[in-house]
């Protein structure tokens, strides 16, 4: 079993403020036209989507819920949640990715509202307005991930859920997510990940506590290259997901 460290992030955000990296935006905007090609650089994301969707739905129950998907990219997770009956808004700061997301929504007939806005700006504008916030494969690509977590906590109503996923920071994660996925297996373009931006579970838990979020569940993810199937795991050494609930007032 190997880790799904080859998964491309949804988006890193657009350089409209201090919590964005222009290089990250340029890097992933260049891949925007490949979002919905299951055999492109985004194949791992397509393969992973059923697992993370089922995990999120199992905890939060998406049907009828108002959801914001931060760093939605081309809308793979956003559309999947909408298909389960959620009222989804996908936000991103990559103009190209959002154009792809809008077009695919029209083609598929799955209604998703997309908006080009920073998480912090939306949180300031609409605090406590949604039931669920997702921020998947994105936090390791911004300068200040704690600011994004705080925005997630501000956006969600008391008692609502916040879901995040990212990559742990240790030798195993470096070998698998950077050396293995980018240089040996060449599953991702070189330079996709910056090891220094990886986030340990303890750091993520601290961000959440500071934002008034309680941990509900943490799970790792593993990948079987033969079956091309992702599975939940207790191993959080590389890729992991965390579910939080905003403390009720």
UniProtKB/Swiss-Prot annotation:
Pfam families: Methyltransf_23. GO terms for molecular function: 2-polyprenyl-6-hydroxyphenol methylase activity; 3-demethylubiquinol 3-O-methyltransferase activity; polyprenyldihydroxybenzoate methyltransferase activity. Signal peptide: none annotated. Residues 1-23 are annotated as: Disordered. It catalyses: a 3-demethylubiquinol + S-adenosyl-L-methionine = a ubiquinol + S-adenosyl-L-homocysteine + H(+); a 3-(all-trans-polyprenyl)benzene-1,2-diol + S-adenosyl-L-methionine = a 2-methoxy-6-(all-trans-polyprenyl)phenol + S-adenosyl-L-homocysteine + H(+). Keywords: Methyltransferase, S-adenosyl-L-methionine, Transferase, Ubiquinone biosynthesis. One of its GO terms (biological process) is methylation. Pathway: Cofactor biosynthesis; ubiquinone biosynthesis. S-adenosyl-L-methionine binds at residues 52, 71, 92, 136. O-methyltransferase that catalyzes the 2 O-methylation steps in the ubiquinone biosynthetic pathway. NCBIfam families: UbiG. This is Ubiquinone biosynthesis O-methyltransferase.
